[in-house]
């Protein structure tokens, strides 16, 4: 929590106002933020200075790992995070690549599981990484990236957290996740949960020990209509101790994640928090 609150305070104190063309709002912005999560010791980075929810974030992550491209599939998993971007984004609604209601296009998981090749074939980046790590292989290129500029126009949103690099040191697995843009009051809690859970799950299904997750953010910002709530309500609150994330030990393979895993397979223990804060969301 200290590093999260430190980033929030840094934005409030030192951020620069930038006009965001997509949303039409100003953002108080800083460049470069590095966060670290101790996954090996299960220090789950769930925000305690406001009520936070982890299952929706993990549901979204599972949807990415399965290669989903439809908001309805994410809703079935337990998250509505793609409803707005797939159905309320005017640019996407008028995009000829949009296939209909709830369609997200070629974003996130589609790129991770089905990256299009020039010859008409596809690359399953995630399976390659899982197979390598399961066999104790780290070729210094154990990377899953969702960032495909050649297909940006074919999706409703460019990826924010776009690349995940896995590193194997002995039998301990580490993760470095890269994020180009972060709505800190709303999105960062989701992103922290996902980075932590991704390393925990990948270590579990490849038979490795989980180590550290390194979360690198380029553009970290607070929207103008979020600033007062962050500065005057959330930042003055004292954080509670970190909770722990419990994952069903029966999850042993990528196929398990693709088929039967639900949010009932995840539980948080020891979570204490302050009251909820309703931050505005910008589509």
Curated annotation (Swiss-Prot):
The keyword Transferase applies. InterPro entries: Thymidate_synth/dCMP_Mease, Thymidate_synth/dCMP_Mease_dom, Thymidate_synth/dCMP_Mease_sf, Thymidylate_synthase, Thymidylate_synthase_AS. Coiled coil: none annotated. GO terms for cellular component: cytosol. It is found in: Cytoplasm. One of its GO terms (biological process) is dTMP biosynthetic process. Homodimer. This is Thymidylate synthase. The gene is thyA.
């Amino acid at each position: 929590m200290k590093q999260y609150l430190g980033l929030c305070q840094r934005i409030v104190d030192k951020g620069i106002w930038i006009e965001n063309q997509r949303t039409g709002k100003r953002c108080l912005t800083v460049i470069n933020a590095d966060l670290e999560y101790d996954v090996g010791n299960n220090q789950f980075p769930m925000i305690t200075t406001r009520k936070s929810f982890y299952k929706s974030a993990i549901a979204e992550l599972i949807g990415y790992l399965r290669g989903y491209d439809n908001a309805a599939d994410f809703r079935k998993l337990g998250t509505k995070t793609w409803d707005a971007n797939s159905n309320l984004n005017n640019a996407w609604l008028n995009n000829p690549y949009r296939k209909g209601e709830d369609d997200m296009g070629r974003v996130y998981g589609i790129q991770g599981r089905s990256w299009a090749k020039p010859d008409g074939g596809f690359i399953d980046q995630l399976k390659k990484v899982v197979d390598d790590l399961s066999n104790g292989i780290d070729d210094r290129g154990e990377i899953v990236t969702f960032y495909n500029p050649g297909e940006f126009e074919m999706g409703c949103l460019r990826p924010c957290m776009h690349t995940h690099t896995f590193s194997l040191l002995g039998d301990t697995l580490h993760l470095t996740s890269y994020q180009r843009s972060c709505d800190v009051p709303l999105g960062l809690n989701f992103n922290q949960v996902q980075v932590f859970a991704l390393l925990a799950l990948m270590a579990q299904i490849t038979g490795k020990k989980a180590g550290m997750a390194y979360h690198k953010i380029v553009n970290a910002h607070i929207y103008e209509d979020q600033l007062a709530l962050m500065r005057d309500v959330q930042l003055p609150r004292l954080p509670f101790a970190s909770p722990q994330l419990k994952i069903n030990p029966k999850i042993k393979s990528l196929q398990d994640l693709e088929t039967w895993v639900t949010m009932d397979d995840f539980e948080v223990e020891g979570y204490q928090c302050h009251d909820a804060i309703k931050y505005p969301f910008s589509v």
